[in-house]
Amino acid sequence: MQTSIPNWLMQRAFLTPERIAVYDGQGKKTFMELHESVMKRARQLANTGVRKGDIVAIFMKNSVAMIECIHALHYIGAIVLLQNTRLTSHELAWQLKDSGAVYVIADDELADRIEGNIRVITMSELSALPEENVEFQQYYHFDDIATIMYTSGTTGKPKGVLQTYENHWWSAIGSALNLGLNENDCWLAAVPFFHISGLSIMMRSVIYGMSMYVMRAFDAKKANELIIGGKVTIMSVVSAMLQKMIADLGERRYPETFRCMLLGGGPAPKPLLEVCKAKGIPVYQTYGMTETASQIATLAPEYSLTKLGSAGKPLFPSQLRIEKDGQVARPYEPGEIVVKGPNVTKGYLHRPDATAKAIRGGWFYTGDIGYIDEDGFLYVLDRRSDLIISGGENVYPAEIEAVLLSHEAVEEAGVTGIDDETWGQVPCAFVKRKRGYSVTVEQLKQFCQAHLAKYKIPKQIYFVDELPRNASQKLLRHQLKQLIPNNENGAL
């Protein structure tokens, strides 16, 4: 028997109609007002031909309108494909084609980035459309796909992660059981809704009946003003965001009304945690991914220094273990992080092989390497082996390598992450040129700019004679840093 639950926003509007759902600096809407706006958007989308079961992409920056569109598509029964607004036209076109999306809803200023034979609906166009009657989904079935987000695998080929209503529901419940709920909570959404860290805030808002404050783009000064003014009580950040906020904060301190700084995007630097401790900032370090519908493990503030570098313990509905050579690893023994729970994806869109490889016996094999100490705290050693986390964005070396290898002058390419004070890590490339060909660092960077989002473009490129490989000719990315000249004077 299929598990169903009342439509989240409809139910929330019925239960707490006058409670504030969303602020955006220009105004606010109650849950009932949001519900009414969503019904109108849904009828306008129906006028364009959107139907139940359609995959509809959203290419927008954070806004109340974006929230309305996501809910409106769910009211119709469509599947929402969230698209990163930092993607190039080439990357975007590939994902739209691979997903089978039939429409794209886009901010007016982003619409010209969309290529290919797909119906584009701009926000100005949508707002002007007449309404058409459509049957709303009164219930959400737990097994149904709610959203799709693309994430690159170690092959560099992006995969669409299928996120069900059940995944989002249990992610919200797990977070509430961990962080608790307060009547006056307001979650600051300064991370993008096209990331799971942002979308999960939107889902929690309607499930909890919690207000959220939407920032179109992160602004450290504005975020601090909201926290100090007592307007928000919880915020999701990555280390680079938190560092900017602390720099702007100066000698000021956050009030006791601010109760949670949820820190993701990789382990936090020790100096940052020590500053947060000194300033009384309640930092909760987390570990999660698109495939787990946000956090699956979290470290409470009281352990932030005694368990420095740990991502904490699994959330209540979830399980986590370390496997090495098919066996559960001993404490402190590194191995693959394996997770299980109702918040874990059912698989990848159109990728049965990748799904079968990742999900075995009900457990999801993350590809991340870590260990668990004797107290059950998780420590992540390597994000997806070679994953680069730059300012909270996942950057996959193989994807960059594939672009470099498509250049006529490049014979071999290897990419790894190097430390960066601002972004945590940035990509660094090592290139072997083809004999008889000439190409400069600047030419390669310009080539990458045409095919990759800005944060994926290598910050340094070195020309080398050979790349390190093992006996089976597999690239040894962890040895690439050894190729950086000792007398470092920039790219060679």
Curated annotation (Swiss-Prot):
PANTHER family reported for this sequence: AMP-BINDING DOMAIN-CONTAINING PROTEIN-RELATED, LONG-CHAIN-FATTY-ACID--COA LIGASE
Enzyme Commission numbers on file: 6.2.1.26
Pathway: Quinol/quinone metabolism; 1,4-dihydroxy-2-naphthoate biosynthesis; 1,4-dihydroxy-2-naphthoate from chorismate: step 5/7; Quinol/quinone metabolism; menaquinone biosynthesis
Family designation: Belongs to the ATP-dependent AMP-binding enzyme family. MenE subfamily.
Organism: Geobacillus sp. (strain WCH70)
The UniProt record lists the keyword Transmembrane helix: no
Keywords: ATP-binding, Ligase, Menaquinone biosynthesis, Nucleotide-binding
Entry-linked Pfam families: AMP-binding, AMP-binding_C
InterPro entries on file: AMP-bd_C, AMP-bd_C_sf, AMP-binding_CS, AMP-dep_synth/lig_dom, ANL_N_sf, MenE
Full protein name: 2-succinylbenzoate--CoA ligase
Gene: menE
UniProt keyword Nucleotide-binding present: yes
One MF term in the entry's GO annotations: o-succinylbenzoate-CoA ligase activity
Catalytic activity: 2-succinylbenzoate + ATP + CoA = 2-succinylbenzoyl-CoA + AMP + diphosphate
GO biological process assignments: menaquinone biosynthetic process
Protein's job: Converts 2-succinylbenzoate (OSB) to 2-succinylbenzoyl-CoA (OSB-CoA).
